[in-house]
UniProtKB/Swiss-Prot annotation:
Belongs to the class I-like SAM-binding methyltransferase superfamily. MenG/UbiE family. This is 2-methoxy-6-polyprenyl-1,4-benzoquinol methylase, mitochondrial. It holds the Pfam family Ubie_methyltran. It comes from Drosophila melanogaster (Fruit fly). The keyword Repressor does not apply. PROSITE patterns: SAM_MT_UBIE, UBIE_1, UBIE_2.
Length: 301
């Protein structure tokens, strides 16, 4: 059933792309040129997808993207990945190996996918000592958190509905967290760090709020290990996903940015070095689906 629906969506998207690709490419090129021309003076610049923007602009632009896609975010994840994102997230939480007594910060937690898996994993583990656990779901976009909280209520995964586990939802910037030093035993961020302006600051803040022995884990789109497969994946990403976003969510530009941000993100080894530079030890990564995504892990020792 899922395969049939996904195939139908892909077919519709491919037909739709022929009516939009040429004009959209022209608009993107114009936007990139005008964006570059408008940047003057000494203010630092960064990338927003393939565009060059002022650092002060990127946060607002990313915020606007997720405001636009919040209500359709989970549906689009299923459509874009043909449902495989569910498997990636399951593996991610299994690699974390939640235990009772853990204090987790789920950064860029948005609509709650990682947190809900964490809570269900805990529920399946015996807890004879009744050790209390906690998770803080944090995101820079309040709209995404609102969607997540409503999902939690429907799924029966709120503090009132759980035993020996509390859940908090808090809007926060990953680059300047409002939490005390050494306040969490684990930090997760899934498909969020590439949207941040200063990845080094995000990693530094993650290190700060973790307790000694705490674990940092990141699930993020990455780069395929085979050049031919990377080319095929790029064709799918750029030719299918934006029109699919238009068909299902009425958002071409938002999903154009998302695929561009994936291509701009550092390769696995480079990101591994960035995690090490933030102070983490025993840093490693694991490729899933030939490197479409990678799980990065490090410890604060």
């Amino acid at each position: 059933m899922q395969t049939t629906r996904s195939t139908r969506l892909l077919s519709l998207a491919r037909r739709f792309v022929h009516t939009r690709t040429a004009s959209q490419s022209a608009q993107n090129s114009k936007g990139m040129a005008s964006g570059a021309e408008s940047i003057s003076g000494k203010e630092k610049t960064t990338h927003f997808g393939f565009q060059t923007v002022r650092e002060s602009e990127k946060e607002q632009k990313v915020h606007e993207v997720f405001e636009q896609v919040a209500n359709s975010y989970d549906v689009m994840n299923d459509a874009m990945s043909l449902g495989i994102h569910r498997v990636w997230k399951d593996v991610f939480v299994e690699r974390l190996g939640p235990t009772h007594g853990m204090r987790l910060l789920d950064m860029a937690g948005g609509t709650g996918d990682i947190t809900f898996r964490y809570l269900r994993y805990l529920n399946n583990q015996p807890n004879p000592q009744q050790r209390p656990s906690h998770v803080t779901v944090s995101d820079i976009n309040q709209h995404m958190l609102n969607v997540g909280e409503e999902r939690a209520k429907r799924l029966g995964l709120t503090t009132d509905q759980l035993s020996n586990c509390t859940v908090a939802w808090q809007c926060a910037d990953a680059e300047k967290l409002p939490f005390p030093d050494a306040s969490f035993t684990a930090y997760t961020i899934a498909f969020g760090i590439r949207n941040c302006t200063h990845v080094d600051k995000v990693l530094s803040e993650a290190y700060r709020v973790l307790q000694p022995g705490g674990r940092f884990m990141c699930l993020e789109f990455s780069h395929l290990t085979n050049e031919t497969m990377q080319w095929l994946y790029d064709q799918y990403s750029f030719q299918v996903i934006p029109p699919m976003g238009q068909l299902l969510a009425g958002q071409w530009q938002a999903y154009q940015y998302l695929v561009e941000s994936i291509r701009r993100f550092p390769k696995q080894e480079q990101f591994k070095q960035m995690i090490e530079q933030a102070g983490f030890d025993q840093v490693s990564y694991e490729n899933l689906t030939f490197g479409v995504v990678s799980i990065h892990s490090g410890f604060k020792l």
